[in-house]
Amino acid sequence: MKKYQFLKSNLLQNQNINELFLQYLKNDSNIGVIKSIVDGVVIIEGLSNVKAGEMLQFSNDIQGMALNLNSETVSAVLFGDETKIKPGEYVEGTGNIISVPVGMSLLGRVVNALGQPIDNKGDFPGSELKQVEVKAPGIITRQSVNEPMITGVKAIDCLVPVGRGQRELVIGDRQTGKTSICLDAVLNQKYENSKNKKNALYCIYTAIGQKRSSISKLVTLLEKTNSLEYSIIVAATASEAAPLQYLAPYTGCVIGEYFRDNGKHALIIYDDLSKQAVAYRQMSLLLRRPPGREAYPGDIFYLHSRLLERAAKLNKNFGGGSLTALPVVETQAGDVSAYIPTNVISITDGQIFLETNLFYNGIRPAVNVGLSVSRVGSAAQILAIKKLAGSLKLELAQYREALSFAQFGSDLDETTKNLLSRGNMLTELLNQNRFTPIPIENQFVLMYSGIKGFLTNVNNKVIRSYENELFNRISNYSVFNTNVILLSNNEYYKKKNNNNVVAFFISYFKFITTNIFGFSAK
């Protein structure tokens, strides 16, 4: 572009000079002239050698991306303010597909969709540039999911487990707690990383189309809990251009891939992909691409599949790293059969379905256990939890079935009453406040006490008190804590001589339930 800097935009208004400049373009295919600007889409003459997805440089430091490559013109989208450029000005093709900085120096930082810092903390020393659009790992490089990714949420870790390298969709209506579940998973990694620093899990939170105030609250929460030190936030707010909201998930993904490809572990949250799809639909319609179902373009499935396929667990020959994805999709009135939800459900390895009715009934998180599923996570679930999960799922399924019949009549037999009472107790046991992740060891002890019948005669109103007291005892009683950690270890169930530990648990549960609240344990 430097050799054309003498051509100012006011000179280009002259017809003869404009024609002369277009002749220059035939000899330099990296320079183009703006023909028109409409709704953030720029039509450019020239740029005959430009690539699809190439970064373009406009005047006033405005950047854009080439998308539609026609025989005479190129259609590009802008990443900045379109009022700062005008027809007749020149455009330069950089020759590079969009790249962003990646590396350990990004930890604790907030960046925009182009990887530029927006937290006033300076640049990223020691970082390297990576293209945002790369191919997903092949079959040979992958390994089946075999390590748990502990979220700290009882309902998920016990019933819908997530493994490192898995894609688990979080789906539900607005204001049902989707973001809270994802943030609980981020907050819980502080405890998990302290137990095993070698296999620490780094977190990337990608905010797409959210309010600036929401992102500010998120940063404050992570700073207060000292969780920002292992986290990176990629933000494309609602006020930013649609191309930036479209690009943000790919930027977050390539940042996560840096950890995966270097033998480390990362978790990426896309909150949410519905807004990315809307941004891509807006871009496609402005680019005059043919609309399809719900006015989305024909390649909307590929938009999400090529993104989510990049989450993987690599085998040891390729470093053994992993990238776990928690994409979020918003539904309208619980309709999971809409276009985007069905697309993402078919791509992912399972879904956590949040229901509005459960949320309004005070069940938090509002996970519908019957509709939620994890297709590969159970292979990575801790064996101690897995032993309990089978009984827990069965009892909750029987409870839901009995509950549906109980509403039709008041005359219930004793067995059904006991089933409903026990189901209510287990449901209350799975309740959990947001931003309070629970260590997996504590989850095991709590669920063990419920499933093995120690809370059968307990009033549901005091279960939360029991839970708090139990966790206090675990943290203060060193012998008990040792056995808890032993039980959470996969090696525990591979040993035959574990009767002493089980007997210790039983006696201790009876002590707590009998002496703390004054009721008799069975």
Curated annotation (Swiss-Prot):
Entry keyword annotation includes Manganese: no
Q: Where in the cell is it found?
A: Mitochondrion; Mitochondrion inner membrane
Annotated binding of ATP, by residue: 172-179
**Which keywords does the record carry?**
ATP synthesis, ATP-binding, CF(1), Hydrogen ion transport, Ion transport, Membrane, Mitochondrion, Mitochondrion inner membrane, Nucleotide-binding, Transport
InterPro entries from the UniProt entry: ATP_synth_asu-like_sf, ATP_synth_asu_C, ATP_synth_asu_C_sf, ATP_synth_F1_a_nt-bd_dom, ATP_synth_F1_asu, ATPase_a/bsu_AS, ATPase_F1/V1/A1_a/bsu_N, ATPase_F1/V1/A1_a/bsu_N_sf
S-S bridge residues: none
Does this UniProt record's set of keywords contain Zinc?
no
User: Which Pfam family, giving just one, matches this sequence?
Assistant: ATP-synt_ab
Q: Whom does it interact with, and what assembly results?
A: F-type ATPases have 2 components, CF(1) - the catalytic core - and CF(0) - the membrane proton channel. CF(1) has five subunits: alpha(3), beta(3), gamma(1), delta(1), epsilon(1). CF(0) has three main subunits: a, b and c.
Tell me the function of this protein: Mitochondrial membrane ATP synthase (F(1)F(0) ATP synthase or Complex V) produces ATP from ADP in the presence of a proton gradient across the membrane which is generated by electron transport complexes of the respiratory chain. F-type ATPases consist of two structural domains, F(1) - containing the extramembraneous catalytic core, and F(0) - containing the membrane proton channel, linked together by a central stalk and a peripheral stalk. During catalysis, ATP synthesis in the catalytic domain of F(1) is coupled via a rotary mechanism of the central stalk subunits to proton translocation.
Family, per entry: Belongs to the ATPase alpha/beta chains family.
**Protein name (Swiss-Prot/TrEMBL):** ATP synthase subunit alpha, mitochondrial
Species of provenance:
Acanthamoeba castellanii
Q: What is the lineage of its organism?
A: Eukaryota, Amoebozoa, Discosea, Longamoebia, Centramoebida
Chain's gene name? ATP1
